Amino acid sequence: MKVGFVGWRGMVGSVLMQRMKEENDFAHIPEAFFFTTSNVGGAAPDFGQAAKTLLDANDVAELAKMDIIVTCQGGDYTKSVFQPLRDSGWNGYWVDAASSLRMKDDAIIVLDPVNRNVIDNGLKNGVKNYIGGNCTVSLMLMALGGLFQNDLVEWATSMTYQAASGAGAKNMRELISGMGAIHAKVADELADPSSAILDIDRKVSDFLRSEDYPKANFGVPLAGSLIPWIDVDLGNGQSKEEWKGGVETNKILGRSDNPTVIDGLCVRIGSMRCHSQALTLKLKKDLPVSEIEAILAGANDWVKVIPNEKEASIHELTPAKVTGTLSVPVGRIRKLEMGGEYISAFTVGDQLLWGAAEPLRRVLRIVLGSL
């Protein structure tokens, strides 16, 4: 089996390579090849593979020699290469982090702790396109999958608190630049205990509204503020990110024909790489909270139910705690005043791990027959 990697240097690709190294995945890959869009003929990264030279990621003939292609190169690359490659007669497996092919009928959105049965059926039935899901959707399902898998959810609404990493590496840098620039504007006043906080606040507010605030990537301030819209406007009042929440969740669960209604608002906040979500769910029956917690906790090895208490919540349910880990904590689970079937939940997860790289890493192992 020849496996080709494209986009291994970018943010998601780098996290994928790091995770594959940690899990010794390259030992399960008979022949690994690395492709590039910018440095053809250069030295490939060394993961113990025989092929030491970078190949041309835009060369369809070269790509067609692969049995599996794993790409984190982005949607534009997929749009330019995928169809010509298939048209050339290539019948290999395409594993992709980008959203371009997600909703195609001949593609499966992969999140194996939640939809391993869908993936296995796809492999049996000759499906060759395995696509990583939207980060927010994947993280919600890792946390709340137990309720969805047991068909207990009548509807759900998710209000998100999404990290800068979802918009890209430059946006993460811009967030930190914004934080630093705000501090620099009032550093002297902060150092002086007698300075008035309202004066400091006014200087910060003026700076946030000024042209000097670094916002080339987000377009508006994020540090010290938030952005109540993510992705393009679909023209019906919904953003594309919000639309994905419903359609992708149902596709992952294999129930696009009989969908669970899911909707909500997606908001960008000043977190680096962890998405958080506040959810309201209407269940199909009035279950005790203890039973709900047991169903959630038993769904997979990574979800962690946090007791609905102040100290546990403020220490365990935060981006600061979760960043860089595979843990997906879920807490704030309680009955709402609307009635016994209505529950709240709050969950946090790393946007680059279960939100992006980890489902690809695992589906590659599944296709190779080693997971």
Swiss-Prot record:
Pathway note: Amino-acid biosynthesis; L-lysine biosynthesis via DAP pathway; (S)-tetrahydrodipicolinate from L-aspartate: step 2/4; Amino-acid biosynthesis; L-methionine biosynthesis via de novo pathway; L-homoserine from L-aspartate: step 2/3; Amino-acid biosynthesis; L-threonine biosynthesis; L-threonine from L-aspartate: step 2/5
Residues involved in phosphate binding: R102, K244
EC number: 1.2.1.11
Residues forming the catalytic site: C135, H275
Alphabetized UniProt keyword annotations: Amino-acid biosynthesis, Diaminopimelate biosynthesis, Lysine biosynthesis, Methionine biosynthesis, NADP, Oxidoreductase, Threonine biosynthesis
Keyword Signal set for record: no
UniProt-recorded Gene Ontology molecular function terms: aspartate-semialdehyde dehydrogenase activity; NAD binding; NADP binding; protein dimerization activity
One GO BP: lysine biosynthetic process via diaminopimelate
UniProt keyword annotation of Isomerase present: no
PANTHER family the UniProt entry points to: ASPARTATE-SEMIALDEHYDE DEHYDROGENASE, DEHYDROGENASE, PUTATIVE-RELATED
Function: Catalyzes the NADPH-dependent formation of L-aspartate-semialdehyde (L-ASA) by the reductive dephosphorylation of L-aspartyl-4-phosphate.
Record text on subunit structure and interactions: Homodimer.
Listed name of the protein: Aspartate-semialdehyde dehydrogenase
